[in-house]
Design a protein with these regions (language model features):
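Structured interface patches
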Residues: 1-173
C-alpha cells in the first residue's frame, strides 16, 4: 500500500489527490491476524508539514470467538486520518529533521508514502477486545469444556464449589 507522493509534495498546500487502497495483498496485523481488504480509498491532502491521509477501508479478518474459541470471519470497516512528514526535501534532496511527535508517520527517502502501518494501527484499535462469533453463541461448558453450540451439554455445574461471588448470593435473599 505504497504511493509515490513526490509530485504532490511539489504542489502547493491544499492540493488533493485520491487513490484506491491496494486490495491485492493481505495486510498482516500481527503474528496471528491477517486482514483481507476488499475496498478502500485514501484522500491525500498537501499540508504545510507534509501530507494528510484520510481514508476508509473495508475487509474481513478471521478472529477467535471469546466464548466458544472457534474461528470466525468478521467484517471490518476502518476510517483513518494520519499525518505523514517527508524525510527528504523534495526540491533539494536535503535530509529533513524527524517529526517532533511520535504520532506522525514518515515518508521515505524516495518519497513513498506507505499506508500499511497507519492502516494496521487503526484496524487493531478498532477490533473488539473479546470478539463474539454470534450474539447467540452459547460458549464452552465450564465443566467438560464442550462447545455448547455443537451439542447441548448435560453437565451439572457445581453449585457449591468454586464460586468467587457466592457470598453475594446471601445478600440477595
Amino acid at each position: 500500500m505504497q504511493i509515490n507522493v513526490a509530485q504532490l509534495l511539489k504542489w502547493p498546500v491544499g492540493t488533493t489527490r485520491i487513490h484506491p487502497i491496494d486490495t491485492d495483498q493481505p495486510l498482516q496485523l500481527d503474528d496471528e491476524l491477517t486482514v483481507n481488504l476488499t475496498s478502500g480509498r485514501v484522500r491525500l491532502d498537501r499540508i504545510d508539514s507534509g501530507i494528510l491521509a484520510r481514508g476508509d477501508a473495508e475487509g474481513t479478518v478471521v478472529l477467535e470467538c471469546g466464548r466458544c474459541v472457534e474461528p470466525f470471519t468478521a467484517p471490518i470497516r476502518v476510517h483513518f486520518e494520519e499525518e505523514f512528514a517527508p524525510s527528504i526535501e523534495v526540491h533539494t534532496g536535503a535530509p529533513l529533521p524527524p517529526p517532533v511527535d511520535d504520532l506522525t508517520f514518515v515518508i521515505d527517502g524516495n518519497h513513498i508514502l506507505d499506508l500499511s502501518e497507519a492502516l494496521r494501527q487503526n484496524i487493531l484499535a478498532g477490533l473488539p477486545i473479546q470478539p463474539i462469533c454470534a450474539p447467540t453463541c452459547a460458549g464452552l461448558c465450564p465443566v467438560c469444556g464442550g462447545n455448547r453450540n455443537l451439542r447441548p451439554c448435560t453437565c451439572v455445574e457445581d453449585q457449591e464449589g468454586n464460586q468467587p461471588l457466592a457470598a453475594l448470593r446471601s445478600l440477595l435473599n
